[in-house]
Amino acid sequence: MPHKVFLTRLKLSDFRNYATLALDLDQRHVVLTGENGAGKTNLMEGVSFLSPGRGLRRAAYADVARVGAPDGFSVFAAVDGMEGSVEIGTGTQGTEEGQSRRLRINGTAARTVDELTDHLRVLWLTPAMDGLFTGPSADRRRFLDRLVLSLDPEHGRRASEFDRAMRSRNRLLSEFRPDPAWLSAIEREMAGLGISMALARQEMLGLLSALVERSRSDGTFPSASLSLAGFLDDCAGIPAFELEERYLAMLAEGRARDAAAGRTLDGPHRSDLLIRHREKDIEAERCSTGEQKALLVGLVLAHARLVGDMTGHAPVLLLDEIAAHLDQGRRAALFDLVDGLGGQSFMTGTDRAMFDALGERAQYLAVANGRVSG
């Protein structure tokens, strides 16, 4: 069983509809119940800021700060983490657009938000993800990259640097006579970063697919088969340096085409995550809405188990409205699976009765108008 990582204290200041919030938590799961709009998801969004990135809503920081707040927002948590007890504080100063958030760990300023992954991994599933299988490929790439990031914290940096280099290449190609030496240098950088991204994604799919295959006998949720398409689909077994040279040649040969298009048409930013229902052997987008939800739940739980297996530390799970469309039997099975992961989870719902099967395994909190009571 992986080591249990859990929050013991959570404080929010000027965060969404919370002027101030202070919660003492124990090791159990946390169930948040209340009417829609009460602030349940806002609270979970606060927890999601204990991971790199912009949280489970991917919102601009200026939008996260409470309306009318004189300054930015802050999130504080005391965590029994991967390296022992730790105090984490993060937030922004001011309400202007384009600002970055600050991070302090045990009172010391962190060099980068990636340091959060030294202490805990936070994963989530929200209703906004329900359209993952039928939505644009960019959503599936983002989903996959978050899966990768949970095991490879450097993946986010590589993706950001690739995007920056690609924008530089696009600007150069828009010029009348771009400097060929500068263009070649940028393409060399893109090749190294792009292939690293592609291989990290392939490795994640291999690990996750193997775990899904081993867990198929559970049967509570359907299992998914996963593959990538759209960029170097036939790269299995080919050395990284050879793939880099291949991508470098693609970029050089595509300069005129990309200049005319105004964008780069080859690269990991064009990949798509393909998902199939294993038992029915059909594409996920052709499944019913209920089947798609069940597939997604199964995939997120499998990934959470993989993170626990690979790191030795169970992730913190944020499951928004997770029980809303499940019957009583499947809800009970879901709670057993979540509990079996060995970590702390936060779950939301409008009706506490939906969580009866959790019993004493959870701490129950009622949320109303930005206030939380036990």
Swiss-Prot record:
Intracellular or extracellular location(s): Cytoplasm
GO molecular function: ATP binding; ATP hydrolysis activity; single-stranded DNA binding
Keyword Cytoplasm assigned: yes
CDD domains: ABC_RecF
Single Gene Ontology BP annotation: DNA synthesis involved in DNA repair
Alphabetically ordered keywords of this record: ATP-binding, Cytoplasm, DNA damage, DNA repair, DNA replication, DNA-binding, Nucleotide-binding, SOS response
Residue numbers binding ATP: G34, E35, N36, G37, A38, G39, K40, T41
GO CC annotations on file: cytoplasm
Pfam families xref list: SMC_N
Tagged with keyword Nucleotide-binding: yes
Matching InterPro entries: AAA+_ATPase, DNA-binding_RecF, DNA-binding_RecF_CS, P-loop_NTPase, RecF/RecN/SMC_N, RecF_2
Biological role stated in the UniProt entry: The RecF protein is involved in DNA metabolism; it is required for DNA replication and normal SOS inducibility. RecF binds preferentially to single-stranded, linear DNA. It also seems to bind ATP.
Family: Belongs to the RecF family.
Name this protein carries in UniProt: DNA replication and repair protein RecF
